[in-house]
Structures are given as structure tokens and as C-alpha cells.
Amino acid sequence: MKEYQVYLERARSRQQDFLYPLIFREYIYGLAYSHNWSRSIFVENGGYDNKYSLLNVKRLITRMYQQNHLIISANDSPKNPFWGYNKNFDSQIISEGFAIVVEIPFFLQLNSSLKEAEIIKSYKNVRSIHSIFPFLEDKFTYLHYVSDIRIPYPIHLEILVQILRYWVKDAPFFHLLRLFLYHFSNWNRFITTKKSISTFSKRNPRLFLFLYNFYVCEYESIFLFLRNKSSHLRLKSFSVFLERIFFYAKREHLVEVFAKDFSYPLPFFKDPNIHYVRYQGKCILASKNVPFLMNKWKHYFIHLWQCFFDVWSQPRTININQLSEHSFQLLGYFSNVQLNRSVVRSQMLQNTFLIEIVSKKLDIIVPIIPLIRSLAKAKFCNVLGHPISKPVWADSSDFDIIERFLRICRNLSHYYNGSSKKKSLYRIKYILRLSCIKTLACKHKSTVRAFLKRSGSEELLEEFFTEEEEILSLIFPRDSFTLHRFYRNRIWYLDILFSNDLVNDE
């Protein structure tokens, strides 16, 4: 967040409702440029690029205003001869500027809310993705029913802009934003297809992530308001921290905002044991009560999306299942609640009784098939999971090749170390290890056996399997029972702030 202090101090002297002048500030695009370079680990920063200069931005905006909207076609190629430049690259420049500017007022609100609530220190401790799973382990073992919900996309990007207008009132800024979206995302279509939204999100990830997260934040605000109104467990206040985006904390005044829409008595059933978890575009709703109440919440979700956000969702896409019989996918894991049955013999005087005890345990498993599919897509193995060489890396040195494979293996091992069964994780390590050996053999134009015999690389490649043990041995003796127990059990690393590309839900 430190990189935003430069323009945040300048923005504080202005009213937050007027963001249009900030679009024409040089330092905004300097920050956008540095943000793009900092996200890349394969390219060195060569300094400030002239393509991110304010002069080019002004020229692009002027051309947008002068462009005749009627001659824009939905099938415009990325390089339009009328424009005379690459629209994809220019779209990225302006969208980064839009994203930085529109984040300013919400980041200021987040800072003020954190200071008022005096939770600045605790805020740093709740950023981990893996903090969700200890919550699931504590709560879900007492619940019976779960609903796996995919949050629907809006049919048009105008819906996302309209939601944002409720919070930022700056007509010139939104006029320019609409003009930008019209040119770069085929807004002349009546309905924006999911494919075009996906294309726009890949070309302009930061702006789309902001707009989409704001839409999700608004939907969650109403949902939590309804949940507070229907539950015995009233929440005094709550905060919505959107992943990897520095947004704001919402408070109890949302009751006043939506009171006019829900002024009549709500026919709710009391459900004090409902739990809601979301990451990206997927959410899990679980409850202890009968399926009838879960079905009622399902229809509330559907009507909420249709009436307030004009988003259509089919009721059959939301299924209600028993936790003991259904696995749900979240954050790259398959999770379900297993019933462990044990029989205890109890004796009272001369009578003996057999007592059956049923305990529940949240079982979190590595999804081996999706992971192998992702590795096959990245050319580390075939679709059956057989390791193959990666010739595109053969130009690098042996050390760089091994380091690349080890980095991927460390990331996956670090992320999936909380799984209850490690066999699938060991198989992924095995695939990466053999793929690394085959890549080195391909580089040296040799067979795998001849390469290993000549170079003696077995000891070096043992790092694929021994790294976790070496880390734990710094804390526990290598021959201790504690080390063996910790190595076999799940360990949640709470410093993980993002999901690896290979474990995305999509």
C-alpha cells in the first residue's frame, strides 16, 4: 500500500467526488507503469516508458471523444487502421489509470474505517487465503447442509458502472469511463457475452477486478443485512475485505441505506447457524437446519440478483446437499465432512454395552485430476499424467532449469500442505521431478538414464522431496516423533496471500 501514499496525500486536498481531473495527472500513469513492472518476475525494470506518458494519454482520450460511435464495429481487430495504434495496449494504459483513480476514495474510506475500529494491526493478520480453512474446520463439522453457489456475471458492463455511481458522483469521470468501455469492450452489443467479459478482464485485469469486486461487495452488503435481520446472532458491525484489492470497510449504516427497500416485515425464519464463505466468484452457504430453510435462502439469492442487479440466475444451478455426502470445491481443494464411527465397550456391573460413537472431521483433499490437467496444459506432462520434457526451457542453464521446477514445486507444496492426504501431492512432485530430468536430458541431447549416470544429479534433485523435512528439522530434531507427526499432518501456511495459477477454480 505504500506505493499509493504519493497520490493519496494529493487526493486528500480535493473532494473525493471529483475524480475526473486525476485522470490527467502524470504520476497516476507512472504508478500504473511501476505496478505493471512489479508484477512481472521475468523482466527487469528499465525505467519509465514514454508510452505511459501523460501526452499519449491525452491524445488517446481526445481521439476517443472525436471518434464517431456509429462506425465502430463489434468485430474491430486489435489493430484498427483508423486508430493507427494497438488498441489492446492503449486499453491497458487507460484502464490502469481508471483503476488507480477510482480506488482512491475507497482506499481512504478503508483507512478511516480501520482507524475508527482500531483494527489496523489485526487487519494484517486476516489477509491469508488459508485462514478460511481453520474456520471451516471449526464450524462445518457441526453443520448438515451446504450450498455451492457460483456468483453470476452481469449481462452488461453498464450494470457494474451503475453500481459504482451510487458511491462516486462525478459525471465527467463516468462519461469518460463509459466512452472507454464502449471503444474497448464492444459496448454496442445489447448483451455482453461471458466470452467478451472474459476477454476484457484478461486485457484489463485491474479495472475489471475492481468493478466486479464492487458488484460482489454490494450484493454481500444486502445479503449480510438480510442475514442480520433473520438471525438471532446480530452482528454489531462487519467488514468486507475484497481479496488483493485495497477497498473499504462497510459498517452498520447499510441498514439505513436499504431500509426503504425492505420497510415491510420480512417473513424470515430464524436461522442462527448459517455460515457464508466466498473467494473470487464462488461462495459456500452452509446451515445446520432443515433443507427447507436453505431452499428459502436459495430463492432470496436468486431474487436479489434479479431485482437489484438485473442478473439472471437459474434456480437449478444452486444445489443443496448434505455435507456428509457431498464434496465442495474451494480455493483449489476438495472438501467434505467425513463420519468416523467407533465402537466402545462399556461395562456396568455384570452387564456389557456396545456404544457407537460418531465423530465428524473435515476432510480436505488435493484435487489430483484438475492439477494434472493444469500441468498438462503447462506442458509438464500429458493428459494421463506421464511426465514430458519442456523444450522451451532448454536454452537456460542447468541451474536455472532446476530452480524453475523447484519454484513451482515449492509453491504447490506450500499451498497444498494443509491437505489431509499427501499421496496426491507426492505424485505432483514426482511428475515435476521427472519433467525436470527429461528437460535436462533433452538439453544435453541424451537419455534420462545416461544423463543421470554422467552428471550424478540424483542428489540435487532430491530437493523435490526433502525441502519440507529440512524446514521442520530446524524446529524439531530430525529423529523426533514430533517431526514425523507434523510432517504427516496438515500444516496451514497463513502467509499465503494469493492462489497459484495452477489452483484457480476456473
From Swiss-Prot:
Coiled coil: none annotated. Pfam families: Intron_maturas2, MatK_N. Keywords: Chloroplast, mRNA processing, Plastid, RNA-binding, tRNA processing. It comes from the Eukaryota. One of its GO terms (biological process) is mRNA processing. Its main location: plastid. GO terms for molecular function: RNA binding. GO terms for cellular component: chloroplast. It is found in: Plastid, Chloroplast. Usually encoded in the trnK tRNA gene intron. Probably assists in splicing its own and other chloroplast group II introns. Belongs to the intron maturase 2 family. MatK subfamily. This is Maturase K. It comes from Trifolium striatum (Knotted clover). The gene is matK.
